[in-house]
Structures are given as structure tokens and as C-alpha cells.
Amino acid sequence: MNQEIMNLFNPTTPAQVFDQIRISIASPEKILSWSYGEIKKPETINYRTFKPERDGLFCARIFGPIKDYECLCGKYKRMKYKGIICEKCSVEVTLSRVRRERMGHIELAAPVAHIWFLKSLPSRIGLLLDMTLKDLERILYFEYYVVLEPGLTALKDRQLLSEEEYLRAQDEYGQDSFTAMIGAEAIRELLKGLELEKLETHLRAEMQETDSDIKHKKLAKRLKIVEAFRFSGNKPEWMIMTVVPVIPPDLRPLVPLDGGRFATSDLNDLYRRVINRNNRLKRLMELRAPDIIIRNEKRMLQEAVDALFDNGRRGRVITGANKRPLKSLADMLKGKQGRFRQNLLGKRVDYSGRSVIVVGPELRLHQCGLPKKMALELFKPFIYSRLDAKGLSTTVKQAKKLVEKERPEVWDILDEVIREHPVLLNRAPTLHRLGIQAFEPVLIEGKAIQLHPLVCSAFNADFDGDQMAVHVPLSLEAQLEARVLMMSTNNILHPANGLPIIVPSQDIVLGLYYLSILREGLPGEGKLYGEMAEIEHALHSKVIHLHTKIKYRCEGMDEEGKPVTKWYETTAGRAMLGQVLPKHPRVPFDTINKLMTKKEISGVIDQVYRHCGQKETVIFCDRIMALGFYNAFKAGISFGKDDMVVPSSKWKIVEDTRTLAKEFEQQYNDGLITHGEKYNKVVDAWSKCTKKISEDMMTEISAVKKNPKGGEAQINSIFMMSNSGARGSQDQMRQLAGMRGLMAKPSGEIIETPIISNFKEGLSVLEYFNSTHGARKGLADTALKTANSGYLTRRLVDVAQDCIITADDCGTKLGIKMRAIIDAGTVVASLASRILGRTAGEDLREPSTNRIVVKRGTLMEESHVDALQQAGIQEVKIRSALTCELVNGICGKCYGRDLARGTPVNHGEAVGVIAAQSIGEPGTQLTMRTFHIGGAAQINEQSFIESNFDGKIVIKNKAIAKNSENLSVAMVRNMVVAVVDADGTERATHRIQYGARMRVDEGDMVKRGQRIAEWDPYTRPVLTEVEGIIGFEDLVEGQSISETLDESTGIAKRVVIDWRSTRGGADLRPAIVIKGKDGKVQKLARGGDARYMLSVDAILSVDVGSVVKSGDILARISTESAKTRDITGGLPRVAELFEARKPKDAAIIAEIAGTIRFGRDYKNKRRISIEPMDKEEETREYLIPKGKHIHLQDGDIVEKGDFIVEGNPAPHDILAIKGIEELAAYLVNEIQEVYRLQGVLINDKHIEVIVRQMLQKVEITDQGETDMISGEQIDKIEFDQINAKAKEEGKKIATGTPVLLGITKASLQTRSFFSAASFQETTRVLTEAAVNGKVDPLEGLKENVIVGRLIPAGTGASMSKIREVAIKRDKMILDEREKQAAAIVPTAPEAEPLALPTPE
């Protein structure tokens, strides 16, 4: 009978409707209630009849029939016997589908421990009983007895006894004087005997008493698990199993293969092993076998059950016939191939096809070419239904035949079906949401899918053999979403940065660039044209050239929309470009009246989108694409050998550099400079040489040449390609026609000898060999990068997946301050770019007049940002995802503008996932390597500060001394020079290096480009603050100082050596002191002695007895040694920041403001303490390894947050010392830094969303009168709720500090255990969730995908909203009805009993 008809008669039970899912430990009673019968035999199916054995693992009596509505012996067949149990074979006649749902069980002859609660660390059983895992295993695996009741004997409670000790104790005290047991029974008794309430009171009391930190932590852990058992309704003894559930047979199938063999699921083997051992144990017990045999059997049973639940967690892995480990129940869930990730989160879909893509330049932006053959297959059901509706076929079979024969009417119907039915195109890897877009299919001949050229950058596709997949949205809702949300015309802007992503590239750019070139001196220059037709005529008759400078009268629009005409100096090409520009007052002809490079074109598209809207933009893009292709073809730009111009000055520059390098070599041989310095200088010289040659080559290539008639000649083709942004970069041109330059070794160091040849001249054998290192490393890196970047994206998505816009405004007053990011004097990210599309967190006032420019709560558009710039506002407080106060999700105001649409963000937008994709997608472009900074990278070491603005100098924390050479020297580390304009607005601030020579003073006027200060970038000085005579302390020749004589100059150089490693030098403390005329040590202004400690490798600049003035250099520390440190860059750096790892050589940060004091050294560490200014705080102490250079002196004053030892700060320290805002600013800037280096633009808000997710937890510092445990980490939301409740009841509230978690850790600690379990460490997450009886409220995206519902984002969010409203209304209506019913029913009088007729 047909399946559909059966389903009519058998309406399936409606799917359960649920709002949340709870997980807990199953009690034996629960397992029995699930079970349909006990499995007694290990047999599976009979190998001859293929029928399941009775009471075996596939028993039909327990699990249900094998065929629909047919018992095993065949007595009852068909539907009419539904529900009957056959008396012969005892099988219920029903659907065979029940074999996927019905469970069985195995009654164990002896209890066994559940391995997850035993071995999944921390061991839950161990924590509850306060026993070590080792002891537990000894008891469980029958090595030791445990005393349960010591009675009146000298034994202790829970004491372990070996076999001998046990027998001896029995002899000594008598058999019944104490109780001791062994195995899982013993543990079960112990767990049963726990009184959780008493235990909890006892633990809390103990925690109050203890002072030891470690003990407190241990007690807190126990307390937590005791509470978990108390409140979750789980009983501790359930962790020991007496019944094992057996999963339904169709979930562990056994399939006969041809040749009489069977393919089976590993679970069957594991179950068989359990049943065999269990049956053997039962038999041995009946036979009253010796204890030792029974014990061995019990141990084997425990091992069999362990292997079934989690093979390999304890002891040897149990393997199958072919030495392959068997897949246990836990393995079914874990990892990429497990249930969660393979089947629940990612499924394969039908109605899909894939093919190679080719370019479709004649398509419109919303179209794609779909091969007819493919369309016919994909839309088959639709075609069948249309054929049926038109009466061309009566049955599906007939329709099938028609389609197979490809009759003409089938093609007509296909056209009908496809019309306005969008399809989804996807290119793997789908790194961000633009990797799947919807298009309207256009039927084409051939077998390749045609793709519109402008969407290639979104898909990251090219036509060198890429394949794409097509999916058909079936339901009406799906088609609607595809059209309204996913259509390629709706994805013009990039969600990561809000810039257009539908941007012309390559040939289109080249064509448009060629079209917009203006060349002087061509025939017809200066002619006047009134309209386009005249220009076209002139072009055809060769009166003018495309590039001739002409005057053109162009019609535009004014603000009211009235036409205005204006004369422009332009070219014929640009006039043609002006034809496709939409008419709008904000998009005048000037927009395109310039040389169009890729960047310019992108700007024009952005402008058109902002002012003219989406429809106009799409039409404009299609038009300029056509124009670009056409002109690229007309231009006929090609590229010959002579277009690569080798600069004439090349060999002279090379020769000069060679001489210089020889000089450095000579200096090294003479001992004037160290090897490191020589290496740095040589590499420096070659970098400069490469740069110079490259600059000369660019000037020669881009030079404007004249043709014989005096006009400008055609521009160099290669220069056009590179300059327009179509293909190639200056760097590649340098390698073609300049010199290849320096190469790196595989280790990342730079090879001293550069490659002098370029590709045009050809490389020598040695040069070629040197260049293979880098190339090979590049390929290896790329392979690793892809995997790493993918993993980063996965972690980001997982941590942010439940971040959704759930409300318009949370009403918070908080926000973060934004200012332009300035690096070494250049603006890297302007204030305008950072605040565009964000909400103002306060009224923004113009500093000079105090008038409000932007009101609080305004979403800042381009116009507002311009106004702020004109008002000269330097710092803006904006709302941010970090400070949003919503309980679930983020509010629209704190998020700001939806970057992909340019409008305020919608409800239900999954901003977390968008943020994760925006950060993860460019991951593959980041580098993988850690840089060894040396030579080439050192050129960008700055040695001066220039002013970027005209203005007046203001110096904060001023401390300047005049030294012996009468130069002004900066004497403190926190001196800041600000440049102030006429209104008193700070235009720029610069932090001055310690020891820098100042070129300006307070109140000086500076011009733009004037130097403010300069310093030696290669050394760090130690300066004196007082004048006097030099004295040495503990500077002993050969112990703490070594003198080297430079032969060529005869100068002695004294360097401090590591005094701890020399004999008798352990207690030395080398220093320079400044003495007065009386021979006493001078005092500093702030009270300490003028004694300057020296660190290893310091080079002395003074002698004993010489006179110094304040500001003179006593010693200098070469930073060259500090400079070859590894700098983690690229992907590893991003991962390090998001994982909140402590960096190697972390900086030490002052936790309080105060005075530095050096204490007694401890082993090989320096002891530094800070005496607080605020007398109520306590002194903080730091131990610092002696090799590290501490640039502070005794008595220096530090601010909170100052670095005591330089380095990368650990994010946790920043959070603890400076707070959330500083931490966020640090993380955002550091991450942006990495992306900026690669030229990737990402909006700050994406990083803020991720950082918000990393700051979800609070660590309890004081529990107050709540049930929380101090030291535990708890969700912010939960923390606030508990505190609010305590406040209501008038109790003392708890206090906590925010904790920063890395993204992996944060994902594992989300409120949803489903989401965490499907991410990583499945076993641990599920064990913990079960012990706590956790409830998953199904709020995030992941959990909803897993249980197969609409996700609560996008259209799913609106659906759930509607559902909520409906439920509320239903409740109201029902309540009303009940009220009315209660009101209507009158109180009836007592009814008389009915008189029943008495039976005869």
C-alpha cells in the first residue's frame, strides 16, 4: 500500500511542542520506564533466516516489527490488525518506524559506575565523596576495600584496606564488628549515605573558617557540586548504574552484505560484550563461584560498560576485528563527524546542483545563467504539477516520460516555472553571508552556470575552474526571503565595513580609467560642445580624441530638482561617463570629472547609493560595467617587454650601496661595531637602495612623454594597469623592472645579500636559489593559514551566535569615548570614520561656542559627522555594544547602523554572527608568521616627532633639564606635548620619549612639519637629575663590568656584565652615584639618593670623578639587543587577543599610583614595591627577573596603569587596573592594527560585539548574604538577578569583578549547554549539564538549529514575536471565558438520586 495513504489512516502523533530542554541523570526507574523489555541474549539476527533472535539485541517483541503492519511469523498482515499482539511470536502489529524509537534495557547483575561521572575531570563522584580518583578506581576495579561502618574498631570511616589488611582486620576485630565493601556496590552505598543538606552546612562553615586560598577553592568546588545535586533533583547514587539502556535497533543497524557477511554498527559489538559478561556473571553467582572469579567478572563487566559509554577513556581502547577502535556512544556525539556537527548543524540538502562557472557580462545584476539541463532536473516536481494542471499528463509516470523525452511543451513549462522563482548560488568556502546570494535564473544552453562579473568579489570567485552550487528555495516564504533579503541587488554594501562590495575590478576598471584620461596638446583641444550627440559625432569623424581636453555644457539638477546647466572642462570620455550617472543634486558631474581609479569608482558608487537609493545604484553599476568592458576592448591596452622601464640610475645606486656595505664590513672587522649592528646597517642600506630604485622606476614609467606633434603620448600600459588598481602593484612592478631586493630565510631573518637583478634582466643562479626560500615558505604558509583562519571563524561564531538585536533602546547612560587613532603622527583611523553610523552617547557641543551640534541619542549620518568635524570636536562619547544593558541581546541604539543596508539596524538582526564573519572572513589574507624584527623592519623606527598642525605648544607634566651641551632634555616618561590651535582646541598630542632632545618650549608657535623633539632610536639613556661628581658602586672589573679596548680608535668601552654569573658577584648591586663637593651622595628633589642602578649590557658614558650636569647621560642601553624580539603578527596575534592569552614577556603594570621603592632582591629577581599616595591602599610588591630592564629609579612617581616593565600588556591586567572601557579600546586597537597592516577594513562595532561576549562573567569577590560562593564565576545577568532579590529581602548583596574570558572558554560557558556541547569538549559539557540538571532555554541560533526550529533571528524573530503575542491572547481569552462561565452557572439545588428500575 502507498505510504501516503497509510499516513492518512495513521495520523502521526503531533510533534512535541516545547520551549526548553532539560538534561539530567537518568535514574534506574526512569530507564525502566523507557524500556520495552529486557535484552537477555547477545544474539542479533539469525544468519539463515535474517530474522531477529528473540530476546536478542534486535528482538522484534521488544522493539517492534521489521515490516510495516506485519508480525514476525507472518500470521497477521495488513492494517486491519493494527495494535494486535501476535500470540505466536508476541510481536505487536504496527509501523516498523517504532524500531527507531523503542528502547530496551539490560539488568546488570552488579552495579557499575558511569564512566563520565568518574573519569571526566573533575571527577564528580570523587568531588562528592572527597576521595581522589586513584582511590576510587582502586575500589571500583576491585583492588581495595573501603570501610563503610568502622563500628567500635580502630578503623577509620572511608579507610582503604588491601585484601591482606581486610582479612587481618576481620581476624582481629571479628567478622561483624565493622562493614567494608569493594567495587561499585561500595561506592553506591557511600553515595546513598550522603546527607547533602548537612554536608552543605558543614562545607559553608569550613569555608568561613579557612584562611588558605587553595583549601577555599577546593571547598568551593565541592560546595558547588553538592548544591547542584540538591537543587537539580538528581540523586548521587544514580551515578552508579544498575540498569543499562539499549538504544533502538534502527539507530545501530546491522546490514547483510552480499557474500553472507554483515556490516554492523560498533555499538552492537559493545552491547554484546556487556550482555555476555553480564550473563556469565549471573551464572557464576548462581553457581556460587569463588569470590576471586566473581570479582574478576564484575571488573570485566565494569570495563565493558565503560567501553560502551566512552571507549578509550580508561585503560586500553577496545578494538574490533581489524584493530580499529570501536565507536562508543560518546564518540557518536563528539567531533566533526559526530552527531552534533555532522547531522544536526550541517545537513546535505536536496534540490541542489553544482557546475563550473563562466562569466556572463550581458546579465543584469540580479540574474544568473542556469543551464537548461540543470533547471529541468532541479524544477522537476514543479514541471510535473504544471503538466498535470495543463492536462498534458494524467499521472506522474506520464509526466516523467514527457520530461525525459524533452518535448517542446516541457521547455515552455520550464520557462513558466522558472519565471520569478529565484535560486540561491553558493561558492565554497562560504566565509561570510555574501557567499550565498539569490539570483533570478535565465535559461542558457551549455552546461556551465553564468555569473555576473560584479558579484565575483563578494563570492571571491574567479573563472579559472571554480565551481558553484545552486539551491532551489521551495516554500513561498523561502522564495520571499530569497528575493527580499538575499537578492544580489540587496547586497551592495559589505557588512564588515559598509563600503560597496559591488565594485568593478580588473578590465572594467582599466576601461573606465582609459576612458577618463585627460591628455594635453591633442588635436581639437579647447573646443566647445553643447550636447553628447555632438561629441559622439566629433569622435567618429576623428576631430577630437577620447582624451582631448574640451569644454562641455552639462545638464544637472539643483537642490529643488530643477534642471541647471553648467560648463565643465572635461574630455569626451568623461562626458560619456557622465551619461550613465543618475541625475541628482548631490551627485554632480564633478563626481566623475577626474581620473577614475578603482578607489574613485568605489567612492562614486557609495555616493550614488547614499543619495539616489538602491535601484538607481544597481542600474548605474550595470551601466558602468558595460561601459568599462567596451572601453577596455576599444583601448586595446597590451603589455610588451619595453613597457617595463629599468631606471637608468639603477647601477649607480647599486654601486654606491655596495661601497657602503663594504665600509660597514670594514668597520666590523676593525671592531668598531658589533656583528648585530653591522647586520642592521647593511640590511638598512640595501632597503634604502631598493626603495630609491623603485622610486626612480616609478618616475620614469609614469613620466608624461610628448609625441612628435607636441601632444602627450599614450601613458605606459603597465603603469595604467597598476595605477588604476586593475592589476598589479608598485611592488610587483619593482620586481619586474627595478630590483627584487632583500629576501628572507625560512626562519624569517633577512639575508644580507639582496637580489640585485629584476625579472626583465633575469636572475643569476645564486639569486634564484636565494629567492626559492621565500616562495616555498609562502606556499606552506597558505595551506596552514586556511585551516587556522577557519578555526578562528568557528570559535568567533560560537561565542557570538546568540547576540541578536532584541530591542530598540535599552536606555543606558553609559558609552565609550572615541577619538582619532594617530600612529607616529599620521592619522590611521579618523574620528569621522569611527563614529559614522553610531549613536551619540551625550549632547555633543562645539568647544568654542558651547552650542549643541548633535543631540544625545542621534544616529550619526554623514551630515552629522561633517558638522562635528567643522566644529573641531576631538572626542565623542558614543553608545556601544559593550555598554548595552539589555539582558538578552543588544539594543538597536547601542549597535547603530546596519552596515550592509546603511539604515538603522532591524530587530532580530544576528549581529553576533555578522561580527564573527566580518572578522573571520579576511583571516585568510592575514599573515601567519611571527616577525623577527631586524634590518628592513627597523627602518620605520622613528627618531623624531614633527607637528602635523600649525599652533601653540602646551607641555603637560613638564620636566626639562639643560645638559652640559646646553640642549634641552626630557627628564620624565609621562611628559606630553600638545599642539593647540587659536580656539584652544587640542589638535594633536605627542608623548615624549625619556631622554629626547626638545626642539620647542612651552608657548612656542610651531608650523606644520616643524620638529618638536628627536632621540636616538637605537639606545635608551640613563640620565642624571642632579649635578655633581660621578662615583661608582659595586662596579668591579671582571665581576660586574668588563672593559674592551677598541684597537682602531683606542677608546675603552665599559659594559656591565651579568654579575650573578661571576664568582663572588651574587650580592653586588652595580650603580652610579652622584656626589656633592663634600663627597656625600647627593639627594634627589623627591627625597631619594642620587643612585642609578644599572642593568646588564648597559654601556657606561662617564668616568669616576667626572663632573656632570642634570640631563647628562650616565649610561646607555642598546635597544638593538631588545629589538630582535619576535613580534607576533597576523592571525596568531588576532587569536592571542581573542583568546585573552597572556603574552610572552608581558608588561608589568602599576596597580596603584604611588612612589617606587626598590626592596631586597630575592634569589634572581628584583623586588619593587609601590608606596601608595592614597594612605588607605596597601603597598603592592612586584618581583621582576633581573635581566629585564626597569627604567624607573627609586623614588620615581608612577600613575595607576603605568608600565613598570615594558612589553605587551596582558588583557586581564588592563581590565583589573583600568577597567572595561580601557580594555575594550586596547583590544579593538590591537586587533584593528593587525588588519590595518593588510589593508583590511573592519568596523569597530564588530570587535566590540565579540569583546562584549568575552565579558559576560563576573567573579564573586564577596558573597554577602546570598547563596553564591566567593571565587566562583557566574553570569552577569544571574548575578544581577540574585542581587536584586537579596536587596528586596533586605540582605547584604554580593560584590563581583568582571572577568575576561577567551572566546573558546566563553563559548564553553554559555547558558546553552546544547551550543557548548556542539562546540568542543562534548563529554565535559554534557556531564556538567546533567549533574546540574541544566535547562536550555533555546535562545541562541545554534540550539534552535539543533532541535530543528526556525532560528530566533531575522524572519524567525518576527515569527516568535507573533507566537508570543498569540499565546498571551489565547490565555486572556481563556481566562475571560472561565470568568464568564463561573458567573453564569447558577447554584443548582441538590439533585435527587435517579430511581433506577430494579432488575427482575
UniProtKB/Swiss-Prot annotation:
Zn(2+) 1 binds at C71, C73, C86, C89. Pfam families: RNA_pol_Rpb1_1 (PF04997), RNA_pol_Rpb1_2 (PF00623), RNA_pol_Rpb1_3 (PF04983), RNA_pol_Rpb1_4 (PF05000), RNA_pol_Rpb1_5 (PF04998). Its EC number is 2.7.7.6. Binds 1 Mg(2+) ion per subunit. Keywords: DNA-directed RNA polymerase, Magnesium, Metal-binding, Nucleotidyltransferase, Transcription, Transferase, Zinc. One of its GO terms (biological process) is DNA-templated transcription. Its cofactor is Mg(2+); Zn(2+). Mg(2+) binds at D462, D464, D466. Belongs to the RNA polymerase beta' chain family. DNA-dependent RNA polymerase catalyzes the transcription of DNA into RNA using the four ribonucleoside triphosphates as substrates. The RNAP catalytic core consists of 2 alpha, 1 beta, 1 beta' and 1 omega subunit. When a sigma factor is associated with the core the holoenzyme is formed, which can initiate transcription. This is DNA-directed RNA polymerase subunit beta'. It comes from Rhodopseudomonas palustris (strain BisA53). The lineage of its organism: Bacteria, Pseudomonadati, Pseudomonadota, Alphaproteobacteria, Hyphomicrobiales.
